[in-house]
A protein has these predicted regions:
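Canonical Rossmann dinucleotide-binding motif of NAD(H)/NADP(H)-dependent dehydrogenases/reductases
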Residues: 11-41
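Active-site loop of short-chain dehydrogenase/reductase
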Residues: 12, 62-63, 87-88, 133-146, ...
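Conserved small/polar residues in nucleotide/adenosyl-binding loops
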Residues: 190-191
């Protein structure tokens, strides 16, 4: 039993923040990483998404831990990565809030909330992931972007600005930490 416990605690880990519907990208990545033999820490501000996903991963023979996390809450993001420990291999930031609205009808709270989830949350997540990867000088950090990361679109001004900020954050982190063995990428998702 002691050998099995030691083996489980030293499993490579993946952290995925932004787990929503079962058919969504975050959930599908969690299932894939679990199939690859990783212990997956799934995080979402929506507990019901976690309650559905974790049993599914375990039923398929994988290891998963649910960690309710608000991407914009620094303490919760730090705690998420403390749960991952030193065995962190992959971190995926998939949080977003794509709600349309005309700019002249937006209030500051609406605009700021989009920025906080897409950009500030990405900063908190990326910073904490890289802190845990640097001692080993290896790891992969992936941010999910969208076509909004590259160009503006009518009625999506808040989302466009937030996602383009996330894109340039990923570029900066790639240039800072790539030479130290940390692979940082922004994957553009276009449906």
């Amino acid at each position: 039993i002691h050998h099995q416990q030691k083996q489980k605690s030293s499993m490579k880990k993946a952290v995925i923040l932004g787990v929503g519907p079962e058919a969504g990208l975050g959930s599908q990545l969690a299932l894939r990483f679990a199939r690859e033999g990783m212990h997956v820490l799934v995080a979402s501000r929506t507990p019901s998404a976690l309650e559905k996903l974790v049993p599914k991963i375990r039923e398929s023979g994988g290891e998963a831990t649910a960690v309710p996390t608000d991407a914009t809450n620094e303490e919760q993001v730090v705690s998420l990565f403390e749960n991952a420990g030193a065995d962190l291999e992959v971190a995926v930031y998939n949080a977003g809030n794509n709600h349309p609205g005309r700019i002249v009808e937006m209030d500051t709270e609406y605009f700021e909330n989009s920025w906080r989830v897409c950009c500030l949350g990405g900063f908190l997540f990326g910073r904490e992931a890289v802190k845990r990867m640097l001692p080993k000088k290896k790891g992969t950090l992936i941010f999910t972007g969208a076509s909004a990361s590259l160009r503006g679109r009518a009625n999506f001004g808040a989302f466009n600005s937030a996602k383009s900020g996330l894109r340039t954050l990923a570029q900066a982190m790639s240039k800072e930490y790539g030479p130290e063995g940390i692979h940082v990428a922004l994957s553009l998702i276009h449906i």
